[in-house]
Amino acid sequence: SKVLSGFYPDFAKEIGAKAADAFDLGVQYPGACQTAPGSAPYFYEEDNWVDDMQLAAVELYKSTKDEKYMKLAVNYGRMEPVTPWMGADSARHYQWYPFMNVGHYRLGNSTDKRVSDEFKRNMRTGIERVFEKAKENPFLNGIPYIWCSNNLVAALLTQ
């Protein structure tokens, strides 16, 4: 809604309210939602969801300034301090999508130094886990060799 607010203020307000409603639904019914991509013979087996809720809470905090969203963002972030593929040997197709935790990045930029330090440390820990895996690899690559591993590379570089 922030992006559209200067162009379509009424619509931006409406989708901002819908974002809060969708978030509340996620709080009420926690968990991953499996996606079947059309007629493909597989589905996206996403296991994690707290990173999505963390990012949603951070963005809702930024748009509403309601402290309850900041507290929820921190709590969701603590449920998954490191993105699970980091340091792992393998993963299923899209198991830990979107492969990086933007919510950690957003909290790492918090004005609350304690929160900022905690989530920067979490990101550093994930990077260190990948580096430790890389030490065991003849190509110095700590990224699991899986379908879409290029996405993991991009996620690591982004983090």
Report each predicted region and the residues it spans.
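Glycan-recognition and catalytic cores of secretory/periplasmic carbohydrate-active enzymes
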Residues: S1-Q159
